[in-house]
Amino acid sequence: MKKAIITILMALLAFAFVFAAEEPPVKYDDINFAFQPSMTRYDAMGQSGIALPTKIDSFYTNPANLGVKRGFALTVPSFGVTFYNIQKMVEDEEAMENFNALIKGDSDAALPFATKYLENLGSGRNLIAKIDGGIGLKLGFIGLGTNVQVKLHAMNYGTSVASQSIIPEVNVAQTVGLGLKIIDTSAFSFSAGVSVHGVYKAYFKGIGGSKILDIVGGDADADKVLLWGTPVMGGYAVPFDVGVTFGLFDDQLTLSATANNLNGTYHMKSYTGMGYLVNSFSEGAIPVPEDAPEARDSAEFEIQTPWTLNFGAAFAPKLNVIQPVITADLIDMFELVKSFSSDTFRASDLLLHLNLGAELGLFNIVKARVGVNRGFMSVGAGIWLPFAELDVAYGWQEFGEELGDHPVDSLAVKFVLGYDK
């Protein structure tokens, strides 16, 4: 009997050891990990414009746009950066003093500035920054795009810096789009398209606010924390979008419907650190230091990202000197229909699904933009130079469940080198 008990205990211990040797997966259900590259013009116009068939990146939201406006465009490269929570930092006098000191080269101001920034993030879900780089090609009715994107998420279920978690996310994506104009007359046109995105995503287990401050203050080694000291989840998905566009009056008025992020399931694995993830692709790419924690076995899991059904309209009369544009989108129609059947539906809930935008161009060189994104204003501008374009956008987004719960502002700047008229 004793031998049987000992055998069972040893089996349980062995099972526990095997289980413990596996890096547990980490999931963040409050973060939507669906991939979309930065589109500054789109942001300035209230994140509306799925029916607007201009600019090479329009096929990321509606692949039918490749059929509506065929031609040539090349971006080599594009680079964009977005910073969030600007207003809180500007209104914080101490934060601005530290920021000005940093600009003047005072490295001692980095830690107090980072502390104030984390304090101003508040509770709940937030974003700190987003950086995008990419190249793109539109050749007739075919679109190609390669994008690398880094996001810094923030999640705080408490009220202090100590309870704040920073979650870095990295995306590498290759997109192929095809759009065909099936009916083409001056009075009416019909286009349809599909785009496929091969996305590899990696995100870190949340890094505590205190650890971030240790890194900024020089009390912790950033390489050790990011490469070897923080578990990372990595995996792939192959989502695709489909879209149709109806054009009227020589495509000056367009009506569109899109289904975005279909098949948005990410097949993920857990890794003991980013260094081990990189070495899983190319063994020895990053030398493992002697004091690094031993790599644990990967655990496989899945992340579901939602697909959305969207409708849009755009009016862009073809004028020579002044080019006005008006756009309107209804986003995530399934959720809107669900809210209609709810006893708690309010008219203001419609604003959570309605995006509006307008643009006024002069000689197709200088452009001013304004929009409403789910009840919040956005503004922006763009200037086109020979083989280069600069776009800027500032606006607000809702990060809460209901309108007004957690609005966050952002400033986006994007520079494009190439030809994209």
Predicted regions, residues:
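Positively charged n-region of N-terminal signal peptides that target proteins for export
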Residues: 1-4
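Bacterial N-terminal signal peptides
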Residues: 7-16
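Hydrophobic alpha-helical membrane context
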Residues: 14-15, 74, 273
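N-terminal, post-signal peptide beta-strand-biased segments of exported outer-membrane/organellar beta-barrel
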Residues: 20-144, 148, 263-266, 410-411
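Outer-membrane beta-barrel porins/channels
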Residues: 21-42, 126-421
